[in-house]
């Protein structure tokens, strides 16, 4: 009995720092109808039981607010509690609705307390607000964004709200496109967060050679650039994927076969090693968007459109993607900003024509509020209310059409070496999963604890 208890304890330690893997979940279906608790539960249950996987047990939310309400708590929260699904909470920061998001956050903490606290892995203040605030975002009619100074104030406000509550120890970050992170005009946000949420879609990098054959390379480069500005802060993969159907973008072709290739070459190395929320479990219910990224079809099912088993993921693909996403070992801050930026020169001239989709099913509406239509179409309405004013647009584009993924200025100390530093990246030089940001591998202290337990077992 004692042996069994010690072994169980050792396994608990070994899995306590496992990376989170899950999907993004909006508060509406593709026809703009609301999702309710039963709908979220069905999605979470399907994700946990996907054929060929160990289960996707985490959910990233874009908003705290139930669709079409003013500040009611999103019903994904009781659904997550019922299904034991961990949560990356999101507060929609654009469009003037932050007060309502804060109200919903406070209500959720008060209503669910420790039940919520034990499931929340992080809080994202905003989603792609800096992208929408950029020149590129304005050109794409992506909707209303937030300038970096305002976003920093929102981050401070959320820290104040959760202090002394069941969420007091939860880390706070922001999610944005990789080329928004590398834009030096947004460096204040990098400084304000605990971690950086990375959104990157090689499929949309249409100004470059973005066929599926080059997708892994584009992904690695964009993650490396993000790590260069992150320094010793973790980078979480908060959105990526490849569409199963829809129109082509440059050399990129949407197909089930290509979606599987991207899953094998990019997703499989990340899963279990880096905190990752894939886009998306299902986006074709009841109507199919163009393009469509869902790995299950129009009927929610545990049977995916392609094999998710990762048996075709190669060692070379794994080590390369791992290295691109590498930071410090869990619980360690060993890789400083100067080390992380040293390899960025290799990709200083890389860029995206469009580093992200300008749509997404189930997000808040085009006008930047939760009262929008729930969908970002490929070309949103060009109405004045759907675009940031000229004065609100960042001085530097997160991604210029001519090349560099960062603005021309030197930016923060973490990025100042991008164009002049030499040598290989500190991240890229390691193929060890222990170097992952958000790694499932053990930190030194945790590893020591596990070793101690097994030494005790051996002595009995």
Swiss-Prot record:
Residues 380-437 have a biased composition (Low complexity). InterPro entries: Beta-glucan_modifiers, Glyco_hydro_17, Glycoside_hydrolase_SF. Residues 1-18 form the signal peptide. A lipid is attached at residue 430 (GPI-anchor amidated serine). Residues 431-460 form a propeptide. It catalyses: Hydrolysis of (1->3)-beta-D-glucosidic linkages in (1->3)-beta-D-glucans. It is a lipid-anchor; GPI-anchor. Its EC number is 3.2.1.39. The active site is at residues 128, 239. Keywords: Carbohydrate metabolism, Cell membrane, Cell wall, Cell wall biogenesis/degradation, Glycoprotein, GPI-anchor, Hydrolase, Lipoprotein, Membrane, Polysaccharide degradation, Secreted, Signal. Its main location: membrane. The keyword Amino-acid biosynthesis does not apply. Residues 379-437 are annotated as: Disordered. Glycans are attached at residues 183, 312, 367, 373. The GPI-anchor is attached to the protein in the endoplasmic reticulum and serves to target the protein to the cell surface. There, the glucosamine-inositol phospholipid moiety is cleaved off and the GPI-modified mannoprotein is covalently attached via its lipidless GPI glycan remnant to the 1,6-beta-glucan of the outer cell wall layer. It comes from the Eukaryota. GO terms for biological process: cell wall organization; polysaccharide catabolic process. GO terms for cellular component: cell surface; extracellular region; fungal-type cell wall; plasma membrane; side of membrane. It is found in: Cell membrane; Secreted, Cell wall. The keyword Glycoprotein applies. Belongs to the glycosyl hydrolase 17 family. Glucanases play a role in cell expansion during growth, in cell-cell fusion during mating, and in spore release during sporulation. This enzyme may be involved in beta-glucan degradation and also function biosynthetically as a transglycosylase. This is Probable glucan endo-1,3-beta-glucosidase eglC. It comes from Aspergillus niger (strain ATCC MYA-4892 / CBS 513.88 / FGSC A1513). The gene is eglC.
